[in-house]
Amino acid sequence: MKNNKKKYALVIILILFIAFFSSQCMMTRTNTESKKTVAVILPYTYNKENSRILDAIRDYAYNNSIILDVWHEKSLSSNKLASIITKEEQNHAIGILLIYPENYLTQQEKHYDYDNVLAITATMQTAFSHYATFENSPSPSYLLPVSARVIKKIQDGKTDCIYIKNTYKLGYESIQMLDTYSRNNHMKDIYIPCQKVDKAAIESGKLDALLTN
């Protein structure tokens, strides 16, 4: 009798274990399937500008359950780009983000007509159907972060003002646009205004968070 009770107990434990394991597998599969993928193609060599753009892209991806498929390219022909885009579409990527393609595309005179591609670019706006860029601003313009030496010149009156390019914002709004495109199938160009920084703006403290990043 005791042996039968032990057998029943073992069977119940085994059933509970199988049920728990199955539920965990289903949860893992559901969580994986719910995540979206964005392909990011960027120059092989990092610099301050690319780094802050990528930081923003990673932050948005983390906060919105997006997987990033990152490509580092030294040189990329139009055929190789088409091949990458086809591969990413087959993997159900919601979009492809090109970071400064002028630094790796070998055929810059072509028009790259892709609805699901957004190019962050300073010089190739006409080459893409959709792009993100900074608005034109009077010089001098600086990338964030701005050095303390430059800020001090403004505070001392040696420089009237400068204009800063927020590359983090550029990257963040770019991946956000691709995410939005995946839901409503509508993409539009992005223009990020340059922020004017003068003595009054610095002394007001309104730009503290921006300038210290």
Predicted regions and their residues:
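Sec-dependent signal peptide cleavage junction
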Residues: 22-35
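Extracytoplasmic/secreted envelope proteins and their assembly/folding machinery
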Residues: 51-54, 58, 78-85, 105-109, ...
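Beta-alpha junction/loop-to-helix N-cap segments that form part of ligand/metal-binding clefts
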Residues: 74-127, 135
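Hinge/cleft segment of the Venus flytrap/periplasmic-binding protein
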Residues: 146, 169, 173-213
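N-terminal Sec-pathway targeting helices
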Residues: 2-15
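Extracytoplasmic "Venus flytrap"
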Residues: 39-56, 60, 69-79, 101
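Venus flytrap/periplasmic-binding-protein-like
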Residues: 115-128, 136-158, 197-198, 202
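Nucleotide donor/acceptor-binding cores
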Residues: 34-38, 148
